[in-house]
Amino acid sequence: MKAWPKVPLGELLRRSDETAVLDPESEYHEVTIKLWGKGVVSRGKVCGNDVVSVRRVVRANQLILSKIDARNGAIGLVPPELDGAIVSNDFPSFDFRAPDECSVAFIGWLVRSSPFVELCKAASEGTTNRVRIKEERFLDQQIALPPLAEQQAIVARLDALAEKTRQVEAHLDAVERDAEHLLALRFRDAVADAPLRPMAEVAPLVRREQSIDLEGRYPELGIRSFGKGTFHKPPLSGSEVGTKRLYRIEPGDLLFSNVFAWEGAIAIAKPEDAGRFGSHRFITCHANTELTTAEFLRYYFLTDEGLLKIGDASPGGAGRNRTLGLDKLMAIEVPMPSLAVQQTFDRLQAEIAALKAKHTAIREANAALLPATLERVFAGSQ
């Protein structure tokens, strides 16, 4: 970065104090600001009659920040769709004094950079959990401001980069949608006219109860909802386990959370899950390898039809009141094409899983590209 002249923010910004005059019968967007430069968004609409404290109006292209979280990157430009939205005094907004000298879009990019977040930290003070930005100190902070033509060139470059990263994400999303659609079609073909067999026959319940040593440690396993797999919980000491029963989990087990299976808390234990334990809330099934595979069953139970059957076997209200019954699970009939057909489908599942793993790495690199570029462009901007 060239040695751009430094300018106090107070020379570029002017506090906006447009008081909101609310119609009791009208609805108004309220504003919130995501952390780490992720944008200014609506937190929902509120009826004017329900607003009991003073509110201010914000306008498109104003700079707005959170007094509490500006030091965590909660700062940005008000988007056009939130013109006329309302905020509390915890969200000061600022007009630009001279847009023909200071590009609004340039500042919009600058405030998303880590150097600017450091500037906000320097303008904040207070004790733990009460740290807030001080507006006067904020406006006294200086930024390096290039000539307008250079500002516009930087904005064009960053806009182009942002669009490219968006296109990469959109392409990966489209490829994965196509892959999931292909998988669904292949599964439909695989189970067409397949006989139904009960879970008790194809993947019976297995319980490996663990004896508890008070001096021992027992790492637990968790299951994410919506088919998101397993995760590791911190280990429990024997004394923490107390009288609770723990059951050993082995790789390849088909796992159900008895309280959240109805929302897709169904997974297969991975090799890295070996040596972990589940409570009585875990239902562990072992696929009969002469008839089926855990991967095929998992896919089925995460389809609309499979989840409907799990829901029917989980009576009760919402949340933890919906408990999957063991006998009801074992009675569920699942489609059983030939083992060869299931294995062919599983190979396709594995190929798509590998594709998604590659995409994850690409997404991570893509997500890091813009922040790294902002860091490079605005290094020394304070």
Spans of model-derived segments:
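Non-catalytic DNA-recognition/assembly elements of restriction-modification systems
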Residues: 1-20, 140-156, 160-210, 331, ...
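A short beta-sheet element
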Residues: 55-56, 60-116, 251, 255-306, ...
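A short glycine-rich beta-alpha junction/loop motif
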Residues: 71, 85-92, 125-149, 276-282, ...
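Disulfide-stabilized, aromatic/cysteine-rich ligand-recognition loop
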Residues: 312
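Sequence-specific dsDNA recognition surfaces
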Residues: 7-21, 31-60, 200-211, 216-251
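A structural connector/turn signal
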Residues: 47, 52-53, 81, 128, ...
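Short Gly/aromatic-enriched secondary-structure transition segments
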Residues: 26-27, 78, 216-217, 269
